[in-house]
Amino acid sequence: GMRGVREWVAAFSEMTGLREAGSVFLEKEEKAYSEVISSLRPKAEGRKVLFYVRSDADLDWRIDVLTDLGMEVAAVAHWHNRFVEHDGRESTYTGIPRIEGVDICGLREAAEDLGVDLIVSGDARTGRTGYRWVGTSTMYIGREGALDWAEKVVRCLSIKPCEDWYGRGSE
């Protein structure tokens, strides 16, 4: 979402004393973001999402984008973590349920129980569940990164899952 952009522009504007220029820049960025999100929203609105991740680190901007698209984050499922996360960027979205210790073999059941339309995960094995899924990465930062990822989310919602996604019928 635009939260990180807003924070960065505010800090940079304050540091350089270019508050007016920062406001003009941010207004243009917000407008460009809103235009694209508005065009994508009808394709995503009302859909439910399950995150399948190692930790909450760096989830907020993704949750912001999904919220802007009119989507509901049903839960954040964490896979078994074998090390301590030192990132420190825990999600500020504390009202979203967390499901701890979900193995890849239990992901399909968790998704079915929640009635989700899409799984968001950095684990490519997620595709084997038979659910639509989208990765967590984008090649860009800021507005461009948020919009690139939003477009991926919407594209993945339009792909029909097939048996090959979870290993059946491909022998």
Question: Can you annotate each of these PLM segments?
Answer:
Residues 1-171:
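An N-terminal assembly and electron-transfer interface module characteristic of large anaerobic redox
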